[in-house]
Amino acid sequence: MKIIEVDEELYQYIASQTKSIGESASDILRRLLNLPVSGVNLTAVDLTQSTMNSTNEEKGTQLPAEKNVVAETPKPSSEQEIRTPARKQSTQSIQHIVTKVKNLLQSEAFQEESKMVVRFLNILSVLYRTNPESFAQATEQETSQGRTRTYYARDEATLLAAGNHTKPRQIPDTPYWVITNTNSGRKMLMLERTMQFMELPEELIDEVRPYFAVV
């Protein structure tokens, strides 16, 4: 795997093109450049100096010398998939979400709630209200290419198109709808993916997990 230094503006652009949770930077660049999908998972785009120079010669441009530095790094295993957030959140923003979610989990109403679907909707509601932009980007990943089901939508009709059995419910205080006919494990997986994309710590995800465990 190769590492190449890019400026902040270019990084933000590449990251904003994420289409699915777990999509690697290589996958994004291959799609943007209309290159065939690699047969090997997480194969990095090999941007060596010679490759970069030849590409820029075709475009009639020259890449600044300081951006040509590449370094060898070990190739990540399949368990170390690169998750590329659409926009990097500040530590303060992340901590704000963490605090709000913890307040919900520790609230008397949440602790006494017996319906798992209500807990599910309440957590999604807090995630949206604390950072609508990041939540929107996260839910888009769940409805993007590669998914066999549509989990989130901005209207009930979109989810009902897959059948009345999906039991769409509007997430409280948000413009989003979500299917609710999933089992507890799937609900937790949906929350986990969303929270990971929003860059929330694994410790917080682990605090949520027991509320969706099958007793």
From Swiss-Prot:
One of its GO terms (molecular function) is DNA binding. Residues 71-93 are annotated as: Disordered. Residues 181-187 are annotated as: Interaction with DNA. GO terms for cellular component: cytoplasm. SUPFAM superfamilies: Replication modulator SeqA, C-terminal DNA-binding domain (SSF82808), Ribbon-helix-helix (SSF47598). Its main location: cytoplasm. Disulfide bonds: none annotated. One of its GO terms (biological process) is negative regulation of DNA-templated DNA replication initiation. Gene3D superfamilies: Met repressor-like, Replication modulator SeqA, C-terminal DNA-binding domain. Signal peptide: none annotated. Keywords: Cytoplasm, DNA replication inhibitor, DNA-binding. It is found in: Cytoplasm. It holds the Pfam family SeqA_N. InterPro entries: Arc_rbn_hlx_hlx (IPR013321), Ribbon_hlx_hlx (IPR010985), SeqA (IPR005621), SeqA_DNA-bd_C (IPR026577), SeqA_DNA-bd_C_sf (IPR036835), SeqA_N (IPR033761). Belongs to the SeqA family. Homodimer. Polymerizes to form helical filaments. Negative regulator of replication initiation, which contributes to regulation of DNA replication and ensures that replication initiation occurs exactly once per chromosome per cell cycle. Binds to pairs of hemimethylated GATC sequences in the oriC region, thus preventing assembly of replication proteins and re-initiation at newly replicated origins. Repression is relieved when the region becomes fully methylated. This is Negative modulator of initiation of replication. The lineage of its organism: Bacteria, Pseudomonadati, Pseudomonadota, Gammaproteobacteria, Pasteurellales.
